A protein has these predicted regions:
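Conserved beta-strand positions
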Residues: 35, 92, 125, 156, ...
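Active-site glycine- and acidic-residue-rich loops that bind
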Residues: 69-72, 98-105, 156-169, 189-191, ...
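Conserved, mostly hydrophobic/aromatic
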Residues: 62, 82, 147-150, 183, ...
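Non-catalytic positions within long, well-ordered alpha-helices that form the structural scaffold/packing
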Residues: 80-83, 147-148, 173, 243
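Charge-patterned, long linear interaction tracts outside catalytic cores
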Residues: 147, 247-263
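Active-site pocket-lining/capping segments in soluble small-molecule metabolic enzymes
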Residues: 11-17, 102-129, 178-242, 256, ...
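Active-site glycine-rich loop that binds ribose-phosphate moieties when present
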Residues: 134-154, 164
Length: 291
């Protein structure tokens, strides 16, 4: 079997109590893992989990939510912990907290503060192929333009439409954004969970399309209960973007449904090979292609 890379994968997880024992059984410790920052957890829990995962060998990318950080002292403490653990990449978001805990009301302010502390971190910023439920397209475009000069990559919100993803990448390229793009796709997860998240994340449009077209039989399957099969979406996106040198890879939203991750990894081995690897990504070795 060839070891040529066919897909570049980053797995998003939440810092749950059993993550350190469950994740290595599902995802190789040489892989890349993005760790969320939820309002009820706070950034400290994200950083602690990221440090612990890094000690196992993972390339960890902690999320830092601007609205959850109390100020410069806490930010510097968090960044120092990450530096000491060898963590060199971050993903910055505004976060879902309604009232900011400190001076950082949006991710642009946090981005500037991190860069003022150290320019050694690679920093990802968010992209929204289907827009944002609380922001206009003009606001999103302006935000991206402001943050891009200090950022290292764009990570897109979860989307169920290869067409919407490709269109978004083309649009930001035309707008002068030449950052590598990690394409956010759902992992194999229950439909009930996806539907409950759809409206909040602003992805209801492509979720409805995926369920309501002739693709339904290929996109949705019944195991013990109805679940989403992301294999076809990943193939379609890969076919569209594999030749783009700034296509960083797939950012897979696992929702900590880790038992299904090995099956997804097996499925990704059927993709046609790409030519380069992005920093902080996991390569999947080549098997005979099924497409």
């Amino acid at each position: 079997m060839s070891t040529e890379a066919v897909a570049r994968i980053r797995l998003e997880v939440a810092p749950s109590a059993d993550l350190l024992t469950q994740l290595p059984a599902a995802f190789d410790t040489t892989g890349s893992v993005s760790v969320t920052c939820l309002p009820h957890h706070g950034p400290g829990r994200t950083v602690e989990a990221s440090v612990n995962l890094a000690s196992l060998g993972y390339h960890t990318v902690p999320h830092l939510a601007a609205r959850s950080i109390t100020g410069e002292a806490e930010l510097h403490s968090l960044l120092l912990q990450l530096q000491q653990a060898g963590v060199s990449e971050l993903f910055l978001v505004a976060g879902d907290r309604r009232k900011p805990a400190g001076p950082y009301a949006w991710s642009g302010q946090l981005l500037e503060a991190v860069n003022a502390y150290s320019t050694d971190f690679s920093i990802g910023i968010a992209g929204y192929p289907e827009g944002h439920p609380q922001l206009s397209q003009e606001q999103l475009s302006s935000s991206l333009e402001i943050k891009a000069p200090l950022a290292s990559s764009v990570v897109t919100q979860m989307c169920f439409s290869a067409e919407a993803i490709s269109r978004y990448v083309r649009t930001i390229r035309k707008g002068g954004i030449e950052l590598p793009v990690w394409v956010g796709v759902p992992g194999p997860v229950s439909i009930r969970k996806l539907v409950s998240l759809g409206a909040r994340l602003g992805v209801g449009r492509s979720l409805k399309l995926a369920r309501g077209t002739g693709m339904a039989g290929a996109l949705w399957r019944r195991d013990d209960f109805l679940s989403y099969d992301s294999g076809r979406l990943i193939r379609e996106v890969h076919q569209e973007l594999a030749g783009d040198p700034l296509f960083a890879g797939f950012h897979v939203y696992s929702f900590n449904d880790l038992g299904r991750v090995p099956g997804l990894m097996d499925d990704l081995r059927t993709l046609q090979p790409t030519t380069t690897l992005a920093p902080g990504s996991t390569s999947i070795p080549l098997s005979p292609a099924k497409i």
